[in-house]
Amino acid sequence: MGRFIFVRVGLLVVFLSLSGTGADFDCPPDWSAYDQHCYKAFDEPKRSGDAEKFCTQQANGGHLVSIESVEEAEFVAQLISENIKTSADYVWIGLWNQRKAPYCVSKWTDGSSVIYKNVIERFIKNCFGLEKETNYRTWFNLSCGDDYPFVCKSPA
């Protein structure tokens, strides 16, 4: 009887420790779960548009990563640090400038609006990446034609 209670309590502790970590999300193999989304960092450098197209082909609803909070930014930075091994100075995210006269409007490639911002430079180019020098925590305005690793995000 004592062993049975110990096992039940042990299983309950494991279940509670996993709740909220994304362990219950249905992500593809080798993808990481966070807040009802799946993420994967890809080490193969691509141009921003090619990386976006690649992400849409990897998972239903997939796009280059959109970052909507400080907590998500920390998660993505950790994911990149653990999975990107190239010496690239930047990693693509899904933020693009959409030039509509007389303004420049930034949007995520998944269509969502920008509600959290962490930009280090003026918006003079059309694409954005996370900068290695800031441990992938700051957004940097980049030329879309450059080749960098990237992170994809899809609904879980």
Swiss-Prot record:
Alphabetized GO MF terms: toxin activity
The name this protein goes by in its record: Snaclec A14
Tissues and organs where the protein is expressed, per its UniProt entry: Expressed by the venom gland.
Similarity field: Belongs to the snaclec family.
Gene3D superfamilies membership: Mannose-Binding Protein A, subunit A
The C-type lectin domain, residue ranges: 34-153
Function: Interferes with one step of hemostasis (modulation of platelet aggregation, or coagulation cascade, for example).
Signal sequence, start to end: 1-23
Glycosylation positions in this chain: 141
Localization (cell): Secreted
